[in-house]
Design a protein with these regions (language model features):
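Well-structured core secondary-structure elements of compact alpha/beta domains
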Residues: 52-68
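FKBP-type peptidyl-prolyl cis-trans isomerase
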Residues: 16-28, 33-51, 67-118
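Short, small-residue-biased leader/transition segments that mark boundaries at the very start
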Residues: 2-7
């Protein structure tokens, strides 16, 4: 499609479920396994650019416990990589939203850096 051609020129790639990513920094380390653990540093933004969540200190997460958009993208990353993700609401918080911060049906933008991979 014309839109996906424009995306490719801008270095934006599409993953399953409509999750878009662009690589900000390449990684050469291990890739997470399904259900494994990941250590990440991230900033989460709403479509208007306002930050709704970020961690200054790297955090470990189990891939089973994160939003679907992360579950789609993180296993494709190598440790050391930093990606910008655009996640459709269906792969984020969907119709429910999240508290006062994220309205229902809101797509989310994350800059996520994969620091380390665990079992």
């Amino acid at each position: 499609s014309a839109a996906s051609d424009v995306y490719k020129r801008q270095g934006v790639h599409e993953l399953p479920e409509g999750v878009l990513y662009s690589e900000l920094q390449a990684g050469t380390g291990a890739q997470p396994k399904a259900g494994g653990k990941v250590q990440v540093r991230y900033v989460g933004k709403l479509p208007d650019g306002s930050v709704f969540d970020q961690n200054q200190t790297p955090q470990w997460f189990s891939l089973d416990s994160v939003i679907e958009g992360w579950q789609v993208a993180l296993p494709k990353m190598h440790a050391g990589a930093k990606w910008r993700l655009v996640i459709p609401s269906a792969q984020a918080y969907g119709a429910e939203g999240a508290g006062d911060l994220i309205a229902p049906y809101t797509p989310l933008v994350f800059e996520i850096e994969l620091l380390a991979v665990g079992d």
